[in-house]
């Protein structure tokens, strides 16, 4: 994308309403614009980040056999009355009526709808297990929306649901999903620590939340450093083998990790001092096992091996996709702007032409840009070099390819790595190879 053609409305001034770094930087960098209290429009660069996160989630969910569906944002109130949650959920649920006076709601979650869909289609234990997921916008009417997309009223979420014939099968599904989540977060460039959690209004008796470490996190966290040091991407786990999943799960649960709500000083004292880690965390994911809570309350049955009907066991698994954008920025920024992990950055690199209309500079920039115009941002504006440097740092592109007249004459460019500030003088070919665009 050429910056002269891009819709990239950056702000020079810090918005007064923005209280935390991610909110300030998302507004300043032109990723989002607020349209109402707690509701944001996603602009092109921000949408590219969302799509990159979605793609990683899809790849990892598909890898464990989950299948993608897409459910509507509006749900029938009758489904929620069947589960008993319509009146219990509280004022966070946005309730509406259509022109015929039928009660609807803007879904804050999808347990009821997916259970109804499953129950209308699956009739035998032979069709189990099943895992379904979707990525959809949701709405919760927060009393005090704040911190930008971190606590908005409308948000993009990936939620998945598993259905199993037994408790043992459901626990295997739960562990499989935990591994998928840990792989997702590592690929996104953040370290999310899994911690035992309350089940809240979802219900159930087994739950973990995943928290990204950041100074502005809502929760105090206490955990064993071993959890932060794990390489989940290289861990060999057979997701179809219950014993392999149990071994993996033990590597998580054998190490202490808790938020302030669940913190146990006696257990914390058992962690060696050199492995103790304390800080604050932002919740970006939550997984639940709740047995037959919804299948029983909604009358969903399948036939077992002996022909007798039974209620399948369920799990529910959520990732805050739009919240992750804010969490990644909170965990990875500096005074100059965002520092995107390469896997989610809106563009692989920014090409900074320091001398517009210089024949050598233009030729090199055009050559580099032509290798991958979809994933390179070419700053071809007639602006001062300082403006281009500042905007590139603000936007947080992993690499900056700086093309000036002196280097251009020698066929050289300067390559700057945003995360470290390191600079390299390289040939065009070597620069492209280093950023992975060759």
Swiss-Prot record:
GO CC annotations, alphabetized: cytosol
Pfam families tied to this protein: HGTP_anticodon, tRNA-synt_2b
Main location: cytoplasm
Zinc is among the record's keywords: no
UniProt catalytic activity: tRNA(Pro) + L-proline + ATP = L-prolyl-tRNA(Pro) + AMP + diphosphate
A molecular function GO annotation: proline-tRNA ligase activity
Keyword terms: Aminoacyl-tRNA synthetase, ATP-binding, Cytoplasm, Ligase, Nucleotide-binding, Protein biosynthesis
Gene Ontology biological-process annotations: prolyl-tRNA aminoacylation
Family: Belongs to the class-II aminoacyl-tRNA synthetase family. ProS type 2 subfamily.
Record-linked NCBIfam families: PRK12325.1, proS_fam_II
Function noted in UniProt: Catalyzes the attachment of proline to tRNA(Pro) in a two-step reaction: proline is first activated by ATP to form Pro-AMP and then transferred to the acceptor end of tRNA(Pro).
Designated name of the protein: Proline--tRNA ligase
Lineage: Bacteria, Pseudomonadati, Pseudomonadota, Alphaproteobacteria, Acetobacterales
């Amino acid at each position: 994308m050429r910056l002269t053609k891009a819709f990239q409305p950056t702000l020079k001034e810090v918005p007064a309403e923005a209280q935390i770094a991610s909110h300030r930087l998302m507004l300043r960098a032109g990723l989002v614009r607020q349209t109402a209290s707690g509701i944001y429009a996603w602009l092109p660069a921000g949408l590219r980040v969302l799509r990159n996160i979605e793609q990683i989630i899809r790849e990892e969910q598909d890898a464990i056999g989950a299948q993608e569906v897409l459910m509507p944002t509006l749900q029938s109130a009758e489904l929620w009355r069947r589960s008993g949650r319509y009146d219990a959920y509280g004022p966070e649920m946005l309730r509406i009526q259509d022109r015929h006076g039928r009660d609807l709601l803007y879904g804050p979650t999808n347990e009821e709808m997916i259970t109804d869909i499953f129950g209308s289609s699956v009739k035998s234990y032979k069709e189990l297990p099943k895992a379904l997921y979707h990525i959809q916008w949701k709405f919760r009417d927060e009393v005090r929306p704040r911190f930008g997309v971190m606590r908005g009223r409308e948000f993009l979420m990936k939620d998945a649901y598993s259905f199993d014939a037994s408790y043992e099968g459901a626990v295997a599904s739960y562990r499989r999903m935990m591994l998928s989540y840990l792989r997702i977060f590592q690929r996104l460039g953040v370290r999310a620590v899994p911690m035992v959690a309350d089940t809240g209004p979802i219900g159930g008796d087994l739950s973990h939340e995943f928290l990204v470490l950041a100074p502005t996190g809502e929760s105090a966290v206490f955990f064993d450093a071993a959890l932060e040091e794990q390489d989940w991407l290289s861990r060999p786990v057979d997701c179809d083998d219950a014993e392999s999943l149990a071994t993996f799960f033990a590597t998580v649960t054998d190490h202490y990790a808790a938020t302030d709500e669940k913190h146990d000083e006696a257990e914390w004292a058992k962690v060696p001092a050199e492995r103790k880690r304390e800080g604050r965390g932002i919740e970006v994911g939550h997984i639940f096992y709740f047995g037959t809570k919804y299948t029983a309350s909604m009358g969903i049955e399948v036939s077992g091996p002996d022909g007798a009907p039974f209620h399948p066991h369920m799990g529910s698994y959520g990732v805050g996709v739009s919240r992750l954008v804010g969490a990644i920025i909170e965990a990875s920024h500096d005074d100059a702007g965002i520092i995107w992990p390469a896997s989610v950055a809106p563009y692989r690199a920014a090409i900074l032409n320091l001398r517009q209309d210089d024949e050598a500079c233009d030729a090199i920039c055009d050559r580099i840009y032509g290798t991958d115009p979809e994933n390179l941002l070419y700053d071809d504006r007639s602006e001062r070099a300082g403006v281009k440097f500042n905007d590139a740092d603000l936007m947080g592109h992993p690499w900056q390819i700086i093309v000036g007249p002196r280097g251009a004459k020698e066929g050289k460019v300067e390559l700057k790595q945003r995360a470290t500030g390191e600079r390299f003088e390289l040939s065009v070919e070597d620069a492209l190879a280093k950023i992975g665009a060759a």
